[in-house]
UniProtKB/Swiss-Prot annotation:
Biological processes annotated in GO: glutaminyl-tRNAGln biosynthesis via transamidation; regulation of translational fidelity; translation
Keyword Ribonucleoprotein: no
Domain of life: Bacteria
Record has Ligase as a keyword: yes
GN (gene name): gatC
Cross-referenced InterPro entries: Asp/Glu-ADT_sf_sub_c (IPR036113), GatC (IPR003837)
Protein name per the record: Aspartyl/glutamyl-tRNA(Asn/Gln) amidotransferase subunit C
Top enzyme class: ligase
Job of this protein: Allows the formation of correctly charged Asn-tRNA(Asn) or Gln-tRNA(Gln) through the transamidation of misacylated Asp-tRNA(Asn) or Glu-tRNA(Gln) in organisms which lack either or both of asparaginyl-tRNA or glutaminyl-tRNA synthetases. The reaction takes place in the presence of glutamine and ATP through an activated phospho-Asp-tRNA(Asn) or phospho-Glu-tRNA(Gln).
Pfam families recorded: GatC
Catalytic reaction(s) noted: L-glutamyl-tRNA(Gln) + L-glutamine + ATP + H2O = L-glutaminyl-tRNA(Gln) + L-glutamate + ADP + phosphate + H(+); L-aspartyl-tRNA(Asn) + L-glutamine + ATP + H2O = L-asparaginyl-tRNA(Asn) + L-glutamate + ADP + phosphate + 2 H(+)
EC number: 6.3.5.-
Species this protein is from: Corynebacterium efficiens (strain DSM 44549 / YS-314 / AJ 12310 / JCM 11189 / NBRC 100395)
Keywords per UniProt: ATP-binding, Ligase, Nucleotide-binding, Protein biosynthesis
């Protein structure tokens, strides 16, 4: 079973913009390694002859007809927005330049 390193967890944390302590990096490395082991065990299950399914129940859902309903105009939607520019909602920047 491949071992997940502390550096790999640190790299993933950076990509996810998470600030993790050294203790958390070590803890998560062990937990992710355990998860990979469990997934590996599931992959090794003999499923020969088992019919693939997306849900354990065979209940079929019924779809409703598409109905056109009145919605807000763009002006109505933007009317109560705290900040609008060029007909769009303005939101605070969360990513730095070049990220």
């Amino acid at each position: 079973m491949p071992e997940i390193s502390r550096d790999q967890v640190a790299h993933l944390a950076k990509l996810a913009r998470l600030a993790l302590s050294e203790e958390e990096l070590q803890q998560f490395a062990g937990q992710i390694d355990d998860i990979v082991g469990h997934v590996s065990a599931v992959q090794n299950v003999d499923a020969e002859g088992v019919e693939p399914m997306s849900h354990p129940h065979s209940i079929m859902t019924t779809m409703r007809d598409d109905v056109v309903v009145k919605t807000l105009t763009p002006e109505q939607a933007l009317d109560q927005a705290p900040a609008v520019e060029d007909g769009r909602f303005m939101v605070p920047q969360i990513l730095g330049e070049g990220d």
